[in-house]
């Protein structure tokens, strides 16, 4: 059906609600015992299923044409591989030393430095406007997609439909994102049947979920649409806007290394928060490589090396990075890549 004459854009039957989308829904808390992943078959969805009919009702209430929505969903295909990928993301299966080795490669460091050289004026302007250092804008891009090289091979419609209707553990979140995707494709003039992204439905060089795309993407050069695949001005400004909106503090530290003295081990908190203070962590035996005062909100992070557990302490800007991806491994990789890119440019300037 996808190869038939279905390359249309969604039409509105009325005013599409929400020029500004609501904030992305936080991930649902994991149950005490995780349910087994559902077993699904590849193929089109049965649109008579009550949950699909309810979804159509919900998006139609937001102004989308019911018939057009039904036609688009009829083209969606359930993808068993998507469920498999959701069950084993790299951030959950790798130790820090393994994850860091994957992310801090010469390709990513050199690529970030090269992109900075090519777009220095643009990056400097955006950094000033949004008060976010350029190296962190580049590092998010590097970790996410190697600067736009790997933006995903799945049809986003398939990915979001599979997770919305055949992945009970996160179904409410992904049904919301599927609705946001249908609204987004209309607003940006995209064909919902051809947009590709990750197995989770993230799109473009920044891997924004549809709700984040609608809320945080910026039309920096005032073109017809917000293009997060090919337009560097939109890409840089959008990641800067995302970090800025979540409370990035310009010039403030992200991480500090720490050493544990006189205690066997410390257990990092299960959930990402800044409920601790530097003083409280120091009182538990941590020597933290920073001159920040004891009252500074802080987060203990475990960074497993090959043969020993090391510790780091995250601050407000670390927390902001985890709003992009809640894994502390991800946020540490973004920080370390940012430092590596900046160091490489500094070394080149010294020659």
Where are each of the predicted segments found?
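Surface-exposed patches in mature extracellular/periplasmic domains of secreted proteins
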Residues: 64-73, 133-139, 192-197, 223-227, ...
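Acidic/His-rich structured neighborhood in mature extracellular/periplasmic domains
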Residues: 98-240, 244
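Ligand-binding pocket segment of bilobal, Venus flytrap-like solute-binding proteins
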Residues: 221-277
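Sec-dependent N-terminal signal peptides
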Residues: 1-19
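An acidic, Gly/Ser/Thr/Pro-rich helix-cap/linker signature
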Residues: 25-127
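C-terminal soluble interaction/assembly domains
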Residues: 258-351
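Short linear loop/turn motifs
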Residues: 70-77, 225-234, 256-259, 293-299
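A short structural micro-motif
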Residues: 75-79, 143-147, 340
């Amino acid at each position: 059906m996808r190869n038939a004459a279905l390359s249309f854009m969604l039409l509105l039957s009325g005013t599409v609600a929400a020029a500004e989308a609501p904030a992305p829904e936080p991930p649902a808390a994991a149950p005490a015992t995780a349910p087994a992943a559902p077993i699904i078959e590849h193929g089109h969805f049965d649109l008579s299923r009550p949950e699909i009919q309810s979804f159509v009702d919900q998006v139609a209430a937001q102004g989308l044409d019911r018939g057009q929505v039904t036609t688009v969903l009829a083209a969606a295909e359930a993808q068993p591989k998507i469920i498999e990928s959701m069950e084993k993301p790299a951030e959950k299966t790798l130790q820090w030393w393994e994850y860091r080795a994957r992310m801090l490669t010469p390709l990513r460091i050199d690529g970030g430095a090269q992109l900075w050289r090519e777009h220095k004026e643009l990056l400097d302007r955006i950094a000033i406007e949004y008060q976010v250092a350029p190296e962190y804008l580049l590092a998010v891009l590097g970790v996410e997609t190697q600067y736009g090289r790997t933006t995903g091979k799945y049809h986003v419609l398939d990915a979001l439909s599979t997770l919305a209707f055949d992945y009970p553990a996160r179904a409410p979140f992904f049904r919301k994102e599927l609705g946001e995707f249908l609204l987004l494709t209309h607003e940006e003039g995209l064909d919902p049947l051809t947009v590709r992204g990750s197995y989770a439905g993230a799109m473009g060089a920044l891997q924004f979920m549809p709700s984040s795309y609608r809320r945080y993407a910026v039309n920096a050069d005032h073109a017809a649409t917000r293009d997060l695949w090919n337009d560097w001005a939109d890409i840089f400004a959008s990641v800067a806007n995302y970090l800025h909106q979540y409370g990035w503090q310009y010039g403030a530290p992200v991480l500090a290394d720490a050493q544990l003295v006189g205690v066997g081990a410390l257990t990092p908190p299960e959930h990402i928060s800044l409920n601790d203070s530097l003083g409280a962590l120091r009182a538990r035996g941590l020597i933290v490589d920073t001159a920040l005062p004891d009252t500074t909100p802080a987060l203990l992070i475990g960074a497993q090396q090959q043969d020993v557990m090391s510790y780091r302490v995250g601050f407000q800007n670390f927390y902001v990075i985890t709003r992009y991806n809640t894994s502390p491994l991800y946020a540490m990789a973004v920080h370390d890549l940012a430092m590596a890119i900046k160091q490489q440019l500094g070394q080149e300037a010294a020659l």
